[in-house]
């Protein structure tokens, strides 16, 4: 069992929005192909990190990796993300990229959409590559949306939330673009909470009362 950080509903001054792209859905068998993070201080961007990862760089000798023949990802993932096999060929390996990525993130609060998915991949990779645990506390925009917007929406994909808040989604499915969209969605949801409940604590109490009545 992964010993991850705690799920929060907060509005911190400093946080990191993260997103990843992978070869598939299972962190035990699939690999990272892109990681991104944007740091916000006082809710304004101050820095960003974005890099592709060659998922075989750390697994095979360089002379076995052929730019024209080596298959790193499926056609489905290529079509979904716009990341091609040729783009991944020249990328660095997971260990090198993750070392810089986790240094960029530091101990800050993490925000992401369905962020447990991202955390699971990063957690497993860091444990495998460096023997360290990834335990930052996190805010999941999916979790907030399911409670906050359940009367307005039937689905809570990032696209659904972007459409609901009239946020441009045309460049989605690259990691850093998804970070930007997730940040904008998060800020809009926090605005809704403050407008409708006054404070996050009032929102928590309202949710708690609904659970007890339900």
Language-model-detected regions and their locations in the chain:
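Short alpha-helix plus adjacent loop in nuclease-associated cores
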Residues: 138-154
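Short Asp/Glu-rich motifs
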Residues: 97, 181-182
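Acidic two-metal-ion nuclease catalytic site recognized across multiple nuclease folds
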Residues: 1-10, 164, 183-214
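Conserved catalytic/binding loops enriched for acidic/polar residues
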Residues: 178
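Beta-strand segments within the central parallel beta-sheet cores of soluble alpha/beta enzyme folds
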Residues: 137-140, 200-202
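Conserved non-catalytic scaffold segment of RNase H-like nuclease domains
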Residues: 2-123, 128, 132-136, 155-167, ...
């Amino acid at each position: 069992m992964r010993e991850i950080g705690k799920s929060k509903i907060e509005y911190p001054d400093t946080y990191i929005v993260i997103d990843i792209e992978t070869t598939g859905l299972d962190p035990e068998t699939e690999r990272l192909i892109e990681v991104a993070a944007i740091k916000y201080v006082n809710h304004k961007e101050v820095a960003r990190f974005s890099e592709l990862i060659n998922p075989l760089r750390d697994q095979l000798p360089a002379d076995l990796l052929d730019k024209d023949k080596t298959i790193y990802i499926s056609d489905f993932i290529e079509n979904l993300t716009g990341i091609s096999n040729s783009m991944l060929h020249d990328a660095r390996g997971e260990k090198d990229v993750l070392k810089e990525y986790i240094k960029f993130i530091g101990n800050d609060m993490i925000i992401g959409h369905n962020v447990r998915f991202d955390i699971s991949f990063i957690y497993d990779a860091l444990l495998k590559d460096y023997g360290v645990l990834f335990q930052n506390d996190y805010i999941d925009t999916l979790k907030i949306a399911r409670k906050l917007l359940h009367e307005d929406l039937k689905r809570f994909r990032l696209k659904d939330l972007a459409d609901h808040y009239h946020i441009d989604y045309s460049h989605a499915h690259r990691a850093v673009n998804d970070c930007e969209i997730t940040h904008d969605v998060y800020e809009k949801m926090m605005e809704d909470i403050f407008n409708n409940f006054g404070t996050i604590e009032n929102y928590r109490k309202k949710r708690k009362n609904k659970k007890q009545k339900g």
